[in-house]
Design a protein with these regions (language model features):
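Cationic, histidine-enriched alpha-helical/coil surfaces that engage anionic ligands
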Residues: 1-146
């Protein structure tokens, strides 16, 4: 069936740029909606979106030729690491909540919450520059399939 479809004759650069741009636009929209009131689950969902973007980006970036690709890859990795750190703190908090009451547990929970809020602030601080960089890459990808 694939060989008879319209996609059979589409170049990898055209198909790849469309897919990657779709992922970028979705991530960009979700990042815009983030704020201090969002639950950690919203941040986690964006982390998963960024992971998809990164894998597609790493797989397809060699077929595109325009300025800023390498720099964006570094920014993408940085954002993904920050989102990953937030998820790690959230997991540690969940583990700690399941443990029986022991001396120092509340103090440790307090430290983890502090790290969660610091990490969330860092994400919110960096997201606008990241959205701007994402928009630029997205526009450059668009030329491959229009």
């Amino acid at each position: 069936e694939f060989y008879r479809s319209k996609l059979f004759d589409v170049s990898l650069s055209r198909l790849g740029s469309f897919k990657l741009r779709t992922l970028l636009v979705l991530a960009q929209k979700r990042l815009k909606s983030l704020d201090q009131d969002c639950p950690n689950d919203s941040f986690h969902k964006i982390r998963i979106e960024l992971k998809k973007v990164r894998y597609a980006y790493e797989f397809l970036s060699e077929i595109f030729y325009f300025d800023g690709l390498k720099k964006y890859e570094e920014r993408l990795k940085d954002m993904q690491e920050i989102f990953g750190a937030l998820q790690d703190y959230d997991v540690w908090l969940g583990i700690l909540e399941r443990l029986p009451e022991v001396a120092g547990k509340e103090k440790l929970e307090s430290k983890i919450y502090k790290q969660i809020y610091k990490t969330r602030e860092e994400i919110l601080k960096k997201r606008l520059k990241f959205i701007k960089a994402t928009r630029k890459i997205s526009r450059n990808l668009k030329i491959y399939y229009i």
